[in-house]
UniProtKB/Swiss-Prot annotation:
This is ERCC4 domain-containing protein EP364R. One of its GO terms (molecular function) is DNA binding. It comes from the Viruses. The lineage of its organism: Viruses, Varidnaviria, Bamfordvirae, Nucleocytoviricota, Pokkesviricetes. Keywords: Host-virus interaction, Hydrolase, Inhibition of host innate immune response by virus, Inhibition of host interferon signaling pathway by virus, Interferon antiviral system evasion, Late protein, Viral immunoevasion.
Length: 366
């Protein structure tokens, strides 16, 4: 049996891994293979293993800032641990570098030029024979880890591991992440805590926004808090960005829709009314259409695994709930549920070393 071991300090990626592995469990073909274990690792951030104790791959994940810091303080030498592990186990080594693709080479990241980071990445590939994989954010890193895991579990057969169609949750996270400063982790918390409709209708008071925390129990960045409060007060520019995150709605179309009215106005209207909005084009005027209108209502009212239906009669009159802020993502309670309450988890024969040297107990299985 194959399994992926994640270091318990990988707080920002583990929530996405749990979701991605849960989806693998739904596939009968992969049901007995999708196993995630969370332990303390001493080499790398992730290990792809085969029972009982064979290490197949070791993966280290760093953001650009982490990479730059490691170049400055010497932690870049941690690669020696990975090289030593490969010498003992003959495992493959992977280095994930997380962040926006292809910044300006002269751009300073943690006081280190991006060109220097590129040079270090090249050395990892040419000198140390490590696979370097660039990822966009935490969610993308999780997807790449699952793809690697699936490839190893299928003995490197090149197949598509899962459906390329994103889930509603992934689309909603992408919607929140369309706002500057909101990462995939924060977007996931917001997607499972409140809907856009809750925010723009005043159901998420500023004092509750101030209590929101990351999976590591840290407060949201001040910039994000100010932005959420600004949206709740009707900031048109931010509303356009949010609306543009809905599938098949770009920035131009979002700006045209919100040209004369605030986002709350459309959330108060029936879907049929929204579908009849006239959109001016270069040579003609067209209607928004039912499919786009339904997508807007669906994703702006999406919260957790539930689609929240907003009653146009009471969206602005509903009692403001007292939100219960959780410090762990698994305990996060969707805001609409809180509102309702307020109102009514030995060595291998091939010579690979055992895992006991690379991790400690405290296993979490998904």
């Amino acid at each position: 049996m194959y399994f992926l071991v994640a270091d318990h300090r990988e707080h920002h990626v583990i929530p996405f891994l749990k979701t991605d592995f849960h989806h693998m469990h739904q596939n009968p073909i992969q049901k007995n293979q999708a196993l995630l274990e969370i332990k303390q690792l001493f080499t790398g951030d992730y290990l792809i293993c085969k029972s009982p104790s064979t290490i197949l791959a070791c993966i280290e994940r760093k953001t650009y800032k982490d990479f730059a810091a490691s170049l400055k303080d010497g932690r870049y030498k941690n690669r020696q641990k990975m090289l030593s592990l490969r010498e003992q186990t003959n495992c493959q080594l992977y280095f994930f570098v997380e962040g926006p693709a292809f910044p300006n080479p002269q751009k300073k990241i943690n006081h280190v030029a991006y060109a220097s980071i590129i040079t270090a990445m090249t050395h990892l590939m040419v000198r140390d024979h490590m696979f370097v994989i660039q990822t966009k954010n935490e969610a993308h890193s999780s997807q790449k880890l699952v793809q690697l895991f699936y490839a190893f579990s299928k003995e490197m057969v090149c197949v598509v591991p899962t459906s390329l169609t994103p889930t509603d949750e992934e689309l909603c996270i992408k919607l929140w992440s369309s706002l500057s400063g909101i990462s995939g982790v924060i977007g996931k918390i917001l997607a499972n805590t409140c809907s856009v409709a809750h925010l723009v209708s005043g159901k998420l008071p500023s004092q509750n926004i101030d209590q929101l925390k990351t999976p590591s129990n840290r407060p949201f960045p001040k910039k994000v808090k100010r932005m959420l409060i600004s949206i709740s007060k009707g900031n048109k520019e931010l509303e356009i960005k949010l609306l543009s995150g809905v599938p098949n709605i770009g920035k131009k179309l979002a700006a045209e829709i919100l040209k004369d009215h605030a986002l709350l106005f459309f959330l108060n209207q029936p879907v049929e009314c929204l579908a009849n909005i006239q959109i001016a084009q270069k040579t003609r005027t067209i209607k928004l259409g039912m499919k786009r209108a339904e997508a807007i209502h669906y994703f702006l009212n999406w919260c957790g695994s539930a689609h929240v239906t907003v009653d146009s009669q009471n969206i602005t009159e509903a009692s403001r709930p007292t939100m219960q802020v959780a410090t762990q993502p698994a305990a996060t309670q969707p805001l609409h549920k809180v509102s309702d309450d307020a109102s009514s988890d030995a060595s291998s024969p091939t010579g690979h070393q055992t895992l006991s040297k690379e991790m400690s107990l405290n296993t979490v299985r998904c």
